[in-house]
Amino acid sequence: MNDTQDFISAQAAVLRQVGGPLAVEPVRISMPKGDEVLIRIAGVGVCHTDLVCRDGFPVPLPIVLGHEGSGTVEAVGEQVRTLKPGDRVVLSFNSCGHCGNCHDGHPSNCLQMLPLNFGGAQRVDGGQVLDGAGHPVQSMFFGQSSFGTHAVAREINAVKVGDDLPLELLGPLGCGIQTGAGAAINSLGIGPGQSLAIFGGGGVGLSALLGARAVGADRVVVIEPNAARRALALELGASHALDPHAEGDLVAAIKAATGGGATHSLDTTGLPPVIGSAIACTLPGGTVGMVGLPAPDAPVPATLLDLLSKSVTLRPITEGDADPQRFIPRMLDFHRAGKFPFDRLITRYRFDQINEALHATEKGEAIKPVLVF
């Protein structure tokens, strides 16, 4: 550690034990070095991944979670070339920037994806966050740890944006919204004349709907048990919104809605029976995208013969196969054109309501909570 570090004072929501509440505490954050940037957070989305890590997915404790931040650059390290103080940015996932996948424009498949985003990646030159007692707190969750008034990210995962949209609402573009829209556009390649069946009408599923409609998909069917979310899906452009519990034969209903079967389908639940329905409703030659987090021992709900005979591809998807530096500006352009109203998914919370926002996410009471500072 560099003993001559300068620090700023901030507030951050710290998780100290598995399953525990997040406590807003005073912290000190060392100034950025190298390719790092210090961000004053304007808003940060709450994602199911935050819940998963709170509840036991292995991350180093104590930790500051949060990985859908947006804000203003306050300081930069000496190696930063594309950002300066005053720039408005959306923060996304971390990547190494130099492996083959990163070099080829696929940072979501970075060979260091797990350690850089979940594994306690270290800051440059021993930089750190200290709690009120002077003890270190892990602070590079998804390269940002943005559940706080300030965060340190890297130049590679800070995307500069314009000043024409509410900065505090843009953070979810860096993960949840990017995951859904990118799954439809980048991974499945949805376009005019094609159809898509989306299983789950949460933030990721409805973002996939927005992405599919933005690029001209013909029919988009959302399968969701919550009546309010089905209604919202129809308002956002779904051709059909089906209640899986009310359909006697769900696969038949999807095939009827799509004129014989969906070109592609997308599962956001991670549940094997649901993925089985996605496979069954997809036309031969189509792709079943999978973004939902399954249980560790969840089986694939199809035999190899099923997949071979139907010629359906199972496609696991991380972060919408997106390069955030390119895809976040594309989503914003869709929004400016009136084709991507992602703000319809957002519910605002104050930062001191963080545990309420986490609860609302867990119970499905809010589609995309955003903590506003």
UniProtKB/Swiss-Prot annotation:
It comes from the Bacteria. Optimum pH is 9.4. Its EC number is 1.1.1.347, 1.1.1.144. Pfam families: ADH_N, ADH_zinc_N. Keywords: Metal-binding, NAD, Oxidoreductase, Zinc. SMART domains: PKS_ER. Zn(2+) 1 binds at C47, H67, C175. GO terms for biological process: monoterpene catabolic process; monoterpenoid metabolic process. Binds 2 Zn(2+) ions per subunit. Induction: By the monoterpenes limonene and alpha-phellandrene. Belongs to the zinc-containing alcohol dehydrogenase family. Homodimer. Involved in the degradation of the monoterpenes beta-myrcene and limonene. During anaerobic degradation of beta-myrcene, catalyzes the NAD(+)-dependent oxidation of geraniol to geranial. Can also catalyze the oxidation of (S)-perillyl alcohol to perillyl aldehyde, and to a lesser extent, the oxidation of nerol, citronellol, cumic alcohol, and benzyl alcohol. Cannot use NADP(+) instead of NAD(+) as cosubstrate. This is Geraniol dehydrogenase. It comes from Castellaniella defragrans (strain DSM 12143 / CCUG 39792 / 65Phen) (Alcaligenes defragrans).
